[in-house]
Amino acid sequence: NNVIERENKGFDVWAYKTAIDQYGWEKLVKFDEMIMMNFTIMGPVYPLNEMFECMDAKDLDFWGVTKFHKYENGDPFGTIKVGYIPEHIQSHFIAVRNSMIKSKQFQNYWNKMGEINDYRDAVGKHEAMFTKRFSEMGFKWDVYADMGEEYNNHPILCATREMIEKKRCPFFKRRSFMQSYDNIISDTFGQSALELSLIHISEPTRQEAIS
């Protein structure tokens, strides 16, 4: 029931770290699951219990709603140590279970998190590497809404309608309404924010989400 007020810096990474530091590991290790979620997504479009029931049935250490698929053609941010963008759970929603919360690897990760100065740091020091790092340590992960690697790298933004209709993804990116026309044409197959709006506010979907 605590609300933490902080200076708006360090992006979502520092918000998560601030909350972790204030609660402390002694309290956090008692949690069954810890959710790290930011405000770059909107929803829910569908009842969240669908997603939680589905993921609760899986033997995992951490999970997310969506993932960014591997991009091997370099590092556009210049901050990712492996030189490319690994497949990763997107940081707008990551749930971490007790098996991982109480691990020294997870605790050391946050205790030693470096300063986040800009968006490139947020991606390179956390989002792009988090899944790869902990997966290689043996922690099991998955995502709820997965369009498949062959579809595109960023389906929650570039295939929003398909994610909602075919995968019942409960969230969509706020940035869907702030895309330039160049991006709409080249990345989202001509899908417009208006089309997404009609899906989001359509009567069957709206009633299902609030029921």
Model-predicted regions and their roles:
Residues 1-198, 202:
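ER/Golgi luminal nucleotide-sugar-dependent glycosyltransferases, focusing on the catalytic module
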Residues 199-211:
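Single conserved hydrophobic/aromatic residue that forms the stacking wall/gate
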